[in-house]
């Protein structure tokens, strides 16, 4: 039989009697002879046409004539690329489509599986589906098994035959009803009812149907490409779409998985992304430096806006899609690694048939379960050891599955529970994700309400501790203050120190708002401080959101603990939330819905406020307007989320390295004796090991109060300076400046400066006392802090972490093949020495050079040596970095261009000097920039190789600790 006139045609011979060996000739080019493959020896995923077309999801077979199905054993078919714009009506043979409906893997020794060809037209019928038997290893990750089957037409089981007839005519290992029902759900979930099939993106995307596929995107997704087109001028949004789609189309599943990890901020993906963009995209229009961030942002926007496109792009296991969406969503829950949500694929092939329930319209149950009693109306349930009575339609109960319907979308994970659910949206689960058209609810409960009988007879009744509700108009954050009915024990997971950083500090280091969620266990009864101290700390970081009127948990009567500082302190922080203030906060958050997301994420407690003078201005100016703009809304010494992304995503700093102790005199997490307080001393939020007399410590101290929400009485947080003998002595030193800020409930940031009265004292500690009802219930002490008044007294930067980024991988600047390298270094403290006036450019002044953001101090004792310009300027001690190549080449990178050697000036051109990772105020000619007191960055043209790198201050003879074997 001849091939059809198409570039992609195949011929399949069906022999009902002899099925051991079936030959499939494949032809991609009419000029080349067809190639033959035997299913007995060739796995399906190695056939050429399966590399281009996902046979399980996007291949439809079109017969040459209807007689071929009934009178002949050999039929001629050709594949149709399923997807909008891919179906052609040019051939009259398209009148009798035959669709590949299902795949089921046998578990017998032969490991054969059958592909059933069943006509989807009611006019054509066959006595039994033709089958293809193949010796194919069962692999759950193979595309043929994991890819769902999508049908845009009415299910054939409702057109041709009844369920009983199906079961008689189907092969033994062929189960249509379960898969067909799931295929319909998947269509509704991804919004693919208008698309004929929803196949693999590799089959859907082509230059011919690219325009149609792009037009089928949502307006939000199109806007993403328009934004990218503006960044890649003069490229149009459709060209950007084609570039990205072609790029993703050529990736392997492993590479796509790495991209998914990159979107979820998981490490070790930089090399792949850089390689792909450097080779596949036009570097001139799509710079490789920004390529990773652009693709990352693009995927985040698309995932959040257009589920259908994500389905086309990542036709992997459905749990990958959900995991990708959950991790990228701004409102995703952040949980400890040991308690992370575990979601399975929606259409996961269940090998244990003893745990499947199929319920049809007539309440016909085919159950192989143990201890299952189900009364369902039009339901499809998969329950484990549950007794459920459900009286609503479209409720799907199964472990780790996702159901998304227009009306009722319930996702229940019931373990050894007896539940009576008589209304919609009743959830009693361990891990559940409910996606409604109006409400998105994420529930997270740890070992709660096991082996209990619960009756839920009202709408929206939840029995768990943490609720995170996202409506289309309102965002609500709940704390359930009620305990289980039978007072069952609540097990709170114990967090290790390394988990504390990932759970507690992302809101400080990443600058997302912080909320320490308390584990309420009191039955509306006041707890004693002793009971509070015994409770374990379980911080779950969420985005503080607005309370809606539909909240089943009314939190108006919940009193938020007050933080009160003693009258003798200069700064007092009192937090009291009343009903009126809650209403004001709701109005403010409603106004913020149209504002940039980063503005909404900034805690109100650290936002800049208008001065009283401006508020009382009567000169006709608008109240609240000011020309002066705050440099940053974040506390000094804490990096912004943009810069954290630069450190981690662009330069490759790992969380393990950023979690190391910054002040060497203490641990990275310092815990109090009773466990109520903790200090953070990591590279992201360091505690300075050295301070100058009278100068502000830019790093400050971050204090956390554990179980802060459990306290029902006033709390007082006192701070004092103590000596090495653990004594308080005001004759030796005192606070010059002190300010305690509440970043979020339970998270405090302490800014300070100290005066040293006794010059013989070299060391000091800061002690924090937590007072409840007039009694000190806990105290904690900072690591040792040393007084250093001049740069010559300061130690050289120690324990420096250094990472590099080659800005242009394919360009060299000299005969030694020097490349443009950007450096970022992190240490406990970097001193910025004053550059003498005679050495500076005329456009910059000594004051300007020493006023960079995050600068810890200048040379000299206190403010006396840096304020007046009339005094004779002392010799400065600026920072410098020495790079020594293994070949003997040495380069000194000075703080200012005026300090560079004449033969090395060409290595610091102006375009490199001006390039910094974040916009900061800097003097012209500065090579080393100080975005923070513990972070420096600089650029230079250096040859590749192995280096020994040393950080030190000029004219300071103290020993430095170099970094050995650093490869550029």
From Swiss-Prot:
Residues 158-177, 352-431, 572-593, 841-857 have a biased composition (Low complexity). Residues 124-177, 348-437, 572-595, 608-627, 837-877 are annotated as: Disordered. Residues 131-157 have a biased composition (Polar residues). Coiled coil: none annotated. InterPro entries: PKHG5/7. One of its GO terms (biological process) is Rho protein signal transduction. It comes from the Eukaryota. This is Uncharacterized protein DDB_G0289917. It comes from Dictyostelium discoideum.
């Amino acid at each position: 039989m001849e091939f059809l006139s198409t570039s992609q045609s195949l011929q399949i011979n069906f022999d009902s009697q002899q099925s051991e060996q079936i030959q499939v000739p494949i032809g991609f080019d009419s000029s080349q002879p067809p190639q033959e493959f035997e299913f007995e020896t060739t796995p399906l995923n190695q056939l050429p046409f399966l590399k281009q077309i996902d046979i399980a999801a996007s291949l439809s077979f079109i017969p040459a004539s209807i007689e071929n199905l009934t009178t002949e054993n050999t039929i001629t078919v050709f594949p149709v690329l399923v997807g909008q714009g891919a179906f052609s009506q040019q051939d009259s043979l398209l009148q009798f489509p035959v669709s590949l409906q299902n795949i089921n893997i046998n578990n017998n020794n032969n490991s054969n599986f059958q592909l059933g060809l069943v006509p989807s037209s009611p006019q054509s019928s066959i006595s039994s589906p033709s089958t293809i038997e193949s010796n194919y290893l069962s692999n759950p990750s193979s595309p043929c098994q994991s890819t769902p089957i999508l049908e845009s037409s009415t299910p054939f089981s409702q057109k041709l035959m009844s369920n009983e007839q199906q079961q008689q005519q189907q092969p033994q290992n062929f189960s249509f009803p379960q898969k067909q029902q799931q295929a319909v759900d998947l269509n509704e979930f991804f919004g693919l009812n208008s698309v004929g099939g929803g196949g693999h993106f590799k089959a859907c995307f082509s230059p011919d149907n690219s325009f149609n596929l792009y037009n089928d995107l949502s307006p939000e997704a199109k806007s993403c490409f328009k934004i990218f087109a503006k960044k890649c001028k003069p490229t149009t949004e459709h060209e950007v779409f084609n570039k990205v789609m072609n790029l993703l189309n050529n990736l392997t599943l492993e590479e796509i998985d790495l991209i998914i990890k990159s979107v979820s901020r998981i490490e070790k993906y930089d090399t792949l992304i850089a390689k792909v963009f450097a080779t596949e995209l036009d570097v001139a229009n799509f710079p490789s430096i920004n390529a990773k961030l652009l693709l990352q942002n693009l995927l985040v926007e698309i995932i959040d806006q257009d589920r259908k496109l994500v389905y086309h792009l990542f036709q992997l296991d459905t749990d990958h899609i959900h995991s990708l969406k959950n991790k990228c969503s701004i409102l995703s829950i952040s949980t400890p690694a040991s308690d992370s949500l575990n979601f399975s694929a929606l259409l996961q092939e269940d090998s244990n048939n003893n745990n499947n329930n199929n319920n049809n319209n007539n309440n016909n149950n085919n159950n192989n379960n143990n201890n299952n009693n189900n009364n369902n109306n039009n339901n499809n349930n998969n329950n484990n050891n549950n007794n459920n009575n459900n009286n609503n339609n479209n409720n799907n109960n199964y472990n780790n599955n996702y159901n998304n319907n227009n009306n009722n979308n319930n996702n229940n994970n019931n373990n050894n529970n007896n539940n009576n659910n008589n209304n919609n949206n009743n959830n009693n689960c361990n891990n559940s994700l409910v996606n409604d058209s109006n409400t998105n609810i994420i529930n997270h409960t740890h070992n709660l309400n096991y082996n209990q009988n619960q009756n839920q007879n009202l709408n929206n009744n939840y029995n768990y501790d943490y609720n995170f509700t996202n409506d289309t108009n309102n965002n609500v954050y709940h704390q359930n203050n009620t305990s289980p009915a039978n007072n069952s024990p609540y097990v709170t997971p114990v967090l290790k120190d390394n988990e504390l950083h990932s759970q507690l500090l992302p809101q400080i280091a990443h600058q997302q708002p912080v909320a320490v969620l308390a584990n309420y266990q009191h039955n509306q009864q006041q707890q004693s401080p002793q009971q509070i101290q015994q409770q374990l700390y379980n911080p779950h970081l969420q985005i503080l959101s607005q309370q809606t009127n539909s909240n089943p948990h009314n939190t108006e009567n919940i009193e938020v603990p007050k933080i009160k500082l003693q009258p003798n302190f200069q700064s007092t922080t009192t937090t009291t939330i009343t009903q009126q203030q809650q209403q004001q906060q709701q109005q403010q958050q409603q106004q913020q819905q149209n504002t940039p997301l980063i503005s909404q994420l900034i805690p109100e407690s650290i936002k800049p406020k208008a001065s009283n003078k401006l508020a009382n201005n009567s000169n006709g100016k608008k109240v609240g307007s000011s020309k002066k703009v705050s440099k940053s809304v974040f506390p000094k010494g804490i990096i912004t989320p943009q810069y954290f992304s630069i450190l981690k995503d662009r330069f490759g700093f790992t969380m393990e390295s950023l979690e190391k102790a910054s002040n060497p005199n203490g641990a990275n997490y310092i815990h109090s004796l009773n466990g109520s307080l903790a200090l953070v001393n990591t590279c992201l939020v360091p505690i300075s090991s050295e301070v100058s007399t009278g100068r502000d410590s830019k790093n400050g101290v971050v204090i956390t109060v554990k179980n802060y929400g459990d306290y029902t009485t006033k709390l007082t947080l006192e701070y004092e300076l103590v000596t090495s003998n653990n004594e308080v002595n005001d004759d030796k030193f005192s606070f010059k400046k002190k300010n305690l800020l509440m970043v979020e409930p339970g998270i405090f940031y302490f800014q300070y400066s100290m005066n040293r009265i006794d010059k013989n004292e070299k060391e000091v500690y800061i002690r924090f006392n937590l007072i409840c009802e007039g009694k000190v219930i806990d105290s904690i002490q900072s690591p040792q802090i040393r007084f250093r008044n001049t740069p010559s007294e300061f130690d050289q930067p120690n324990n420096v972490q250094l990472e590099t980024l080659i800005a242009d991988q394919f360009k060299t600047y000299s005969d030694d093949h020097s490349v443009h390298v950007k450096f970022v270094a992190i240490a406990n403290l970097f001193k910025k020495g004053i550059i003498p006036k005679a050495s500076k450019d005329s456009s910059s002044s000594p004051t300007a050079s020493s006023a960079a953001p995050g600068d810890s101090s200048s040379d000299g004792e206190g403010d006396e040596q840096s304020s007046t310009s009339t005094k004779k300027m002392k010799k400065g001690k600026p920072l410098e970095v020495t790079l020594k190549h293994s070949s003997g080449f040495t380069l000194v990178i000075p703080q200012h261009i005026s300090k560079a050697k004449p033969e090395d000036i060409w290595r610091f051109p102006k375009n490199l000097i001006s390039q910094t990772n974040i916009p900061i105020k800097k003097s012209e000619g500065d090579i080393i920039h100080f975005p923070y007191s513990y972070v420096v960055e600089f650029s230079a043209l250096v040859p590749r190789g192995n280096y020994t790198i040393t950080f030190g201050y000029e004219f300071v003879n103290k020993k430095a600790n170099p970094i050995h074997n650093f490869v550029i």
